[in-house]
Amino acid sequence: MEKLILRRVDRQNEEMILNFGPQHPSTHGVINFLVETDGEVLKRATPDVGYLHRSIEKIGEMVGYPGFMPYTDRVDYVAAMFANEGYAIAVERLLKIEVPQRAQWLRAISCELCRIASHLVSVGTMVMDIGAFTPMLHGIRERETINDLLEALCGARLTYNYHRIGGVAFDLPEGWRDKVLHFLDHFDKFLAEFDRLISFNEIYVKRLANVAVIPGPMAINYGLVGPNLRGSGVDWDVRRDLPYGAYPNFKFDVPVGKGFFGTSGDSFDRYYVRCLEMAESSKIVRQALDSLPEGEITAKVPRNIKPEAGEAIGRVESARGELAYYVISDGTNKAYRVRARTGSFTAMCIIEDISRGLMVADLVALISSLDVVAPEIDR
């Protein structure tokens, strides 16, 4: 990205240079954009990140392997389960540990519920950013029910620390399965209602269709992942194409953008792919609960973890796409190197190219459609 040089502008025209953030409600975290406009048209929008940098990768090299697990929750506090699982898989591969089947199923259940909760925040805040406040409250209402379920499962509502090296921390509490199924019965009806009221609303469609189009090849070149990549028509999902855990045992579809109301890869496609993914997550949770095997929930893991010297990658399909941990062991009880590859950073990189020529109001829609989360950007 080129550096935006601040300069004087002619007062006789409508050019402006302003800061969009870092505390703007539409930036979804402490993110700043240096925005150059000509009237209501964007000439340039340069992301300015780093406001939430906490050296989390370096922390992973300073504490023991189990000690870093609670920090992974902070990589993406909106969908923390996935960051737990990605790191756990990487360390398990270093240790050559086989995770019990029941633990793999519990991981899938918790992650898919977390995916639904994250997507509810994404689609709800997207509608709110465009100007409709009430639908966001509908999404938060459903998310609160999921938070209650996850709190009953692991004792926390946002930063779960549920996945552990070798398995999971807790088994299902009594009656939890029935509560989840009852919620899913209601949630499937909620999705249909949300589509009717919001997704297919004429005003909403006009605000998103054909806006901020990202063609498939461009999405690949920028390294987009998850719903942002699939929204551009690229059929790629780590759960299916690089299967891990219990996912090979479940049947589910991978929604991709098809130009539902406009052009493939526009803001509406990115939005609606997330809506369709919530329905698929509901299917996966039902299958996992129906086929949940008996057995242990954690493998035998040494108290003092010292993997042999080597390297491993743990990748999962998070709510924001492929989340990968690259961990290097030097044979001690602390990692030599921990690297997290997240989807939000690459999504930020594409904004400058895509935003040129948009209206200022459409920049808000573009940021929302990419579903960036600040701690995933600043690591």
Swiss-Prot record:
Key word Transcription present: no
Protein name: NADH-quinone oxidoreductase subunit D 1
Catalytic activity of the protein: a quinone + NADH + 5 H(+)(in) = a quinol + NAD(+) + 4 H(+)(out)
InterPro entries listed in its UniProt record: NADH_Q_OxRdtase_suD, NDH1_su_D/H, NiFe-Hase_large
Function field: NDH-1 shuttles electrons from NADH, via FMN and iron-sulfur (Fe-S) centers, to quinones in the respiratory chain. The immediate electron acceptor for the enzyme in this species is believed to be ubiquinone. Couples the redox reaction to proton translocation (for every two electrons transferred, four hydrogen ions are translocated across the cytoplasmic membrane), and thus conserves the redox energy in a proton gradient.
Topology in the lipid bilayer: Peripheral membrane protein
Enzyme class: translocase
Main localization (coarse): membrane
MF-aspect GO terms: NAD binding; NADH:ubiquinone reductase (non-electrogenic) activity; quinone binding
GO CC aspect terms: plasma membrane
Family: Belongs to the complex I 49 kDa subunit family.
Sorted UniProt keywords: Cell inner membrane, Cell membrane, Membrane, NAD, Quinone, Translocase, Transport, Ubiquinone
Subunit structure: NDH-1 is composed of 14 different subunits. Subunits NuoB, C, D, E, F, and G constitute the peripheral sector of the complex.
Pfam families: Complex1_49kDa
Listed EC numbers: 7.1.1.-
Cellular compartments annotated: Cell inner membrane
